[in-house]
């Protein structure tokens, strides 16, 4: 059975002090947690070290929101995998829709980043998803399958990779794909992985849902056969709400 994974993506929110306080509150809200669901937190770059220290011994993974595909050099504003690993990150989010939309991330650069993260020994959360226009055009399957196929091109082993389906039209809008809509795309993603790596690998890979997940809808979403947790945005900025979502995966 696949272990659920719930990751809070704090995006560009919270100072270092606020982030540390929120991480501490999340630990308290989770209590003993549950072995059936893995939890992670992705704060801003400046807060990674402090939040990582706050999370020590909690079992909650420290997650980075992005990275560069080069080890070092003249890449102003970027951060390397070595830097992230040095502060204790175990996962890196790659290809988030906001990175694709606002910062020119492409399937090609997503692929380069994935290879760099896996080579570093950290794990990847690969984000895929369609826009509202693409859904209305009926090309959701084509878009998502392409993002998976191109993102994983030349990647031989995806043992340390999680896929997050995030319909762009549902991120931060209050709109949520119905559990059946989400399940349909998750099944398509799993079938795409099956075509690339075989049935055993496709049944083992974890696929999160991201897009206005809340405590009130998490249990229904997580009950779907191909939904293995969530990549949580706004709701992860509230410790009680995030803890409730994690517990929905238990």
Swiss-Prot record:
Pfam families: TIM. One of its GO terms (cellular component) is cytosol. It is an enzyme of class 5 (isomerase). Coiled coil: none annotated. It catalyses: D-glyceraldehyde 3-phosphate = dihydroxyacetone phosphate. Its EC number is 5.3.1.1. GO terms for biological process: gluconeogenesis; glyceraldehyde-3-phosphate biosynthetic process; glycerol catabolic process; glycolytic process. Keywords: Cytoplasm, Gluconeogenesis, Glycolysis, Isomerase. Substrate binds at residues 9-11, 172, 212, 233-234. CDD domains: TIM. The active site is at 96 (electrophile), 166 (proton acceptor). Pathway: Carbohydrate biosynthesis; gluconeogenesis; Carbohydrate degradation; glycolysis; D-glyceraldehyde 3-phosphate from glycerone phosphate: step 1/1. GO terms for molecular function: triose-phosphate isomerase activity. It comes from the Bacteria. It is found in: Cytoplasm. InterPro entries: Aldolase_TIM (IPR013785), TIM_sf (IPR035990), TrioseP_Isoase_bac/euk (IPR022896), Triosephosphate_isomerase (IPR000652), Triosephosphate_isomerase_AS (IPR020861). SUPFAM superfamilies: Triosephosphate isomerase (TIM). Involved in the gluconeogenesis. Catalyzes stereospecifically the conversion of dihydroxyacetone phosphate (DHAP) to D-glyceraldehyde-3-phosphate (G3P). Homodimer. Belongs to the triosephosphate isomerase family. NCBIfam families: tim. This is Triosephosphate isomerase. It comes from Chlorobium luteolum (strain DSM 273 / BCRC 81028 / 2530). The lineage of its organism: Bacteria, Pseudomonadati, Chlorobiota, Chlorobiia, Chlorobiales.
């Amino acid at each position: 059975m696949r272990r659920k994974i719930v990751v809070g993506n704090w995006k560009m929110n919270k100072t270092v002090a606020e982030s540390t306080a929120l991480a501490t509150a999340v630990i308290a809200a989770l209590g003993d947690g549950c072995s059936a669901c893995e939890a992670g937190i992705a704060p801003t770059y400046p807060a990674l070290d402090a939040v990582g220290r706050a999370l020590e011994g909690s079992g909650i993974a420290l997650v980075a929101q992005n990275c560069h595909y080069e080890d070092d050099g003249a890449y102003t504003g970027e951060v390397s995998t070595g830097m992230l690993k040095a502060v204790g990150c175990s996962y890196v989010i790659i290809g988030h829709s906001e990175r694709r939309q606002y910062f020119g991330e492409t399937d090609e650069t997503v692929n380069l980043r994935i290879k760099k993260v896996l080579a570093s020994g950290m794990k990847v959360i690969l984000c895929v998803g369609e826009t509202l226009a693409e859904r209305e055009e009926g090309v959701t399957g084509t878009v998502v399958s392409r993002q998976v196929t191109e993102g994983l091109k030349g990647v031989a082993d995806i043992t340390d990779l999680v896929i997050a389906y995030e319909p762009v039209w549902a991120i931060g809008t209050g709109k949520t794909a119905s559990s059946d809509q989400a399940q349909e795309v998750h099944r398509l993603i799993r079938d795409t992985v099956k075509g690339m790596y075989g049935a055993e690998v496709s049944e083992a890979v974890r696929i999160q849902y991201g897009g206005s997940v809340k405590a009130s809808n998490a249990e229904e979403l997580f009950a779907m056969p191909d939904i293995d947790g969530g990549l949580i945005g706004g709701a992860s900025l509230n410790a009680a709400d995030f803890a409730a979502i994690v517990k929905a995966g238990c």
